[in-house]
Amino acid sequence: MKRMITLLYVTALTGCIPLCAQRTASVSLDPETKFQKIDGFGGCGMNGQWADVYTQEQVDLLWGPDGMGYNIMRIRINPDESNWKSYVNAVKWAKAHGATVFASPWTPPYRFKVGAEQTWGESSNHGHINTDSIESYAKWLERYRQFMEDQGAAIDILSV
């Protein structure tokens, strides 16, 4: 029975290949037709807990005038405050190239959540915000915004 199911599966897959291979797609672009405004393109600075997120050369390559032409930088608000400083230089360099910087937390700190685990000193992505902690969480986000501003790396947009 198992062999028969396997044969049927393989037959079904190989039978689709000629059909899929024969299909063609056509795309037409009309620059005069506009559906939405695109503010720009960018990249995300990932985990920065061990070292600075980007070197200046990397920022120049991505956000600089002779680079990729990015104009938006997204960074993660690390739930561990001791890691906030790792994004400062990259934000300063990107902003020097005119980038818009927006920051978003992937998860609130462990102390503001219920049903969560703590891993490596950070919150896991499990659980959810404790409704009793919403005001404290908002103050924590404001503290982050102020920290970055005090470092000369002001955040343009904070997304939750």
Please tell me what each predicted stretch does.
Residues 1-22:
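Bacterial Sec-dependent N-terminal signal peptides
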Residues 8, 45, 77-80:
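Residues that line or immediately flank small-molecule/substrate-binding pockets and catalytic motifs
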Residues 9-12, 62-67:
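Generic secondary-structure transition motif, activating predominantly at the C-termini of alpha-helices
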Residues 22-56, 60:
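N-terminal module-boundary/linker segments of secreted carbohydrate-active enzymes
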Residues 28-33, 65-160:
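Substrate-binding cleft and catalytic face of glycoside hydrolase catalytic domains
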